[in-house]
A protein has these predicted regions:
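Glycine-rich, positively charged N-terminal anion/phosphate-binding segment
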Residues: 2-6, 26-93
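Short beta->alpha connector loops
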Residues: 21-25
C-alpha cells in the first residue's frame, strides 16, 4: 500500500507527524517509539537565545481537561543546532522546525 504523501511540495514517506511542542525533537521518546516509522518530526519551537518559559505553575486542571502555558521554553538555537540537528539527521526523516 502506498503511504507516501506530498505536503506542500515535500515528499513524506507517510502522513504521520508529531505535534509541535509535545515531542521535543524526539530523542526523549526514542526508546518508546520507532521514530523512523514517522513521516516527519515536528520539533518544539526554538528561539535565537535560550528562553526559560513561564514561571510555575504552568499547568492547571479544569473541568473536562487541563490548560498549559509552558511559554515556549527552549535551549536556544545554538544548543538546538549542536544537540538536536545531529539527532534529527540520523533519523532519515523530514523535520519541521
Amino acid at each position: 500500500m502506498k503511504t507516501s504523501v506530498n505536503l506542500a511540495g515535500v515528499e513524506l514517506k507517510n502522513p504521520v507527524m508529531t505535534a509541535s511542542g509535545t515531542f521535543g525533537s524526539g530523542a526523549e521518546y526514542s526508546e518508546f517509539v520507532d521514530l523512523k516509522e514517522l513521516g516527519a518530526v515536528v520539533t518544539k519551537g526554538v528561539a535565537n537565545v535560550p528562553w526559560p518559559g513561564n514561571p510555575t505553575p504552568r499547568i492547571a486542571e479544569v473541568y473536562g481537561g487541563m490548560l498549559n502555558a509552558i511559554g515556549l521554553q527552549n535551549p536556544g538555537i545554538d544548543v538546538f543546532c549542536e544537540r538536536d540537528i545531529p539527532f534529527l539527521k540520523q533519523l532519515d526523516r523530514k523535520s519541521v522546525v
